[in-house]
From Swiss-Prot:
It holds the Pfam family Ribosomal_S5_C. HAMAP family: Ribosomal_uS5_B. Coiled coil: none annotated. InterPro entries: Ribosomal_Su5_D2-typ_SF, Ribosomal_uS5, Ribosomal_uS5_bac-type, Ribosomal_uS5_C, Ribosomal_uS5_N, Ribosomal_uS5_N_CS, Ribsml_uS5_D2-typ_fold_subgr. The keyword rRNA-binding applies. The keyword RNA-binding applies. One of its GO terms (biological process) is translation. This is Small ribosomal subunit protein uS5. PROSITE patterns: RIBOSOMAL_S5, S5_DSRBD.
């Protein structure tokens, strides 16, 4: 279980990734609602996502931002990129994320780009494998980011020094 990150202490920026129009057919006709997917982050290693549903788009976005601020995770960053390669899987969505050389930029599409930019990762290469549904792609990206470990964490888990890992 990851530790709680207080969103009040961070300068958080949000980005709407997707808005879906959802209809429910009832006896009297169709009921229209909107579902919003929002990613929030401080561009300094903290990122979260949330979904919200409401009858109006602004209200759905507000609910999604509220949920996203409660689901912040910390992402290990080495320089301007990821510490190592990772694959995130959620449902049918799979994301392959690879560290890139400084100056490469964010080579990622749509939902993954939003997550990477708001997490503060400036150089990364990613490939979406499987489902391209925005919600599954974002969840898979988060699963991949949660699996990331920096050298200090790996050394501590193995009970060796960081210098020993470098050999």
């Amino acid at each position: 279980m990851s530790k709680f990150i207080d969103p009040e202490k961070l300068e958080i920026e949000d980005r709407v990734v997707a808005i879906n129009r959802v209809t429910k057919v009832v006896k009297g006709g169709r009921r229209l609602r909107f579902a919003a997917l929002v990613v929030v982050g401080d561009k300094n290693g903290h990122v979260g996502f949330g979904t919200g549903k409401a009858q109006e788009v602004p209200e759905a976005i507000r609910k999604a931002v509220e949920t996203a601020r409660k689901s912040l995770i910390e992402v290990p960053i080495v320089g301007t990129t990821l510490p190592h390669e990772a694959v995130g899987v959620y449902g049918g969505g799979r994301i392959l994320m690879k560290p890139a050389l400084e100056g490469s930029g964010v080579a990622a599409g749509g939902a993954v780009r939003a997550v990477m930019e708001l997490a503060g990762i400036d150089d990364v290469t990613s490939k979406r494998l499987g489902s391209n549904t925005a919600v599954n792609v974002v969840r898979a990206t988060f699963e991949g980011l949660k699996s990331m470990r920096n050298a200090e964490e790996v050394a501590a888990l193995r009970g060796v020094s960081v210098d020993h890992l470098a050999e």
